[in-house]
Amino acid sequence: MIIKDFETFVVGNPPPRFGGRYFIFVKLVTDTGIIGYGEVYCATFSAHTVEAMLKDTAERYVVGHDPFHIERLWRRVYGAGYTQRPDVSLVSILSALEMACWDIIGKACDKPVFELLGGQVHERLRSYTYIYPSKGDVYPDKSDDDHVYVNPDRAAERALDYVAQGFTAVKFDPAGPYTVFDGGMPTGEELDRSEAFTRRIREAVGGEIDLLFGTHGQFSPAGAIRLAKRLEPLDPLWFEEPVPPDNIQAMARVAGSTSIPIATGERLCTKYEFAQVLQDNAASILQLNLGRVGGLLEAKKIAALAEVHHAQLAPHMYCGPIVGAA
């Protein structure tokens, strides 16, 4: 069996736009008629630029090759242009192509892919959600200062809606999303606001529901530590990307200074970057995205690294339907 053709799609995602403003898909077609689908999670360039890069990579490394040869595909693409280093744009494209190959393999074997990667482990998994507006776009008008991202009462009310739906954790940016976003030290007033925002949600949902801090790397190490100390009494389950992900040692400083578990990974790719996170004790919860990390087999390898370090996985699910299924 070989892959004889492919097709790419950029699909707009109408409001409320859960998972992104658009999705980028690839379809691989084999000479036996089996079709596999994959999805790129990449916002580094415009959608159609990413689509052109996807086409180029598929033409050079996928067409004419056996979809079962996952390791060969991975090594050829990862080493393209004599680079052989983590590159989030290239590895996102590789993720989509690898995912589509696994789709073909599963169909050819008449087996769900999870059975080919070790089989089912859990009967049930916990599920969390970000606190989104109850209606309208997840990207509200910037002039609106009364939505769930900044109004603690509205956020608390929405959190209760999610609890009623069966979610056991809710995620939000305690810094009043994007209001503390200068890459540095939060002011005393900003710390007060963050604490009040978090406390209001904790009071609403009680102690049985976990709170997840979905920050976006907007603090310096010292600023993140100050915020963590303020919020530790409210018993959050994790503090996500307290500092930018490009300095693992800085993240490790934060991890060593707070009792809140640190989570990271949505902007990382390949086992090499995740291995560094684990070796430096920078995070104990890994948030890999299947459309960016390097594909299913690469995710399986990262899961093995996490197992060795007694870390946990919480896959990043801001994505389209194919990455979500993967």
Please place each PLM-identified region on the residue numbering.
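Conserved, mostly hydrophobic/aromatic
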Residues: 3, 33, 58, 97, ...
